[in-house]
Amino acid sequence: MAQVRPQGGEVMSARTTRVLRMAMVLAAALDAGTASAFDRGAAAPPFDLPGKDGAAVQLAKLQGRLVYVDFWASWCGPCRQSFPWMNDMQARYGARGLQVVGVNLDAKSDDARRFLAETPARFTIAFDPAGATPRAYGIKGMPSSVLIGPDGKVLYEHAGFTEADRAELEQVIQK
């Protein structure tokens, strides 16, 4: 394996260097946006992203539905914990108008697809390796979620995911 020697220092593997570079790019992408759609009642920024099956995932086509948008990455532990809950919410409330959309932010879709093979999603998956959508939404960490009303306006936002968050998030979805 190739090794890189940073200035004045220890040897790092090329893989470690790549991972650090990707983390810095993602951190910069997430920190770059200062505008936030999180003002309740603000119009949610539109998105048009490639989906898991190749079809476009467009927020505009979900108008009239309650949309739970979750921003996630394959390396995010709490993201992995949130998937069974999101599967459950889609199954329980989908017939009542809920659409869960998971927006993956991995630089390589292969990383996301490996994650999805281990942790299946029974909801819509979209890919945004450039990070334009989280910038538009003012996302600073993962997982982060935004609930968008049938009128296309932001109803709620949440950062993180723990077992304790389940009840709070479900209450918001039920309203």
Task: Name what the model sees in each region.
Residues 114-122, 128-172:
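Thiol/disulfide oxidoreductase modules built on the thioredoxin-like
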Residues 20-46:
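N-proximal helix/coil linker or "cap" segments that precede and/or mark the start of modular domains
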Residues 62-65, 95, 121-122, 139:
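Active-site acidic short loop of glycosyltransferases
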Residues 5, 10-23:
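Bacterial N-terminal signal peptides that target proteins for export
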Residues 80-119, 129-136:
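Structural microenvironment flanking redox-active thiols in thiol-disulfide oxidoreductases
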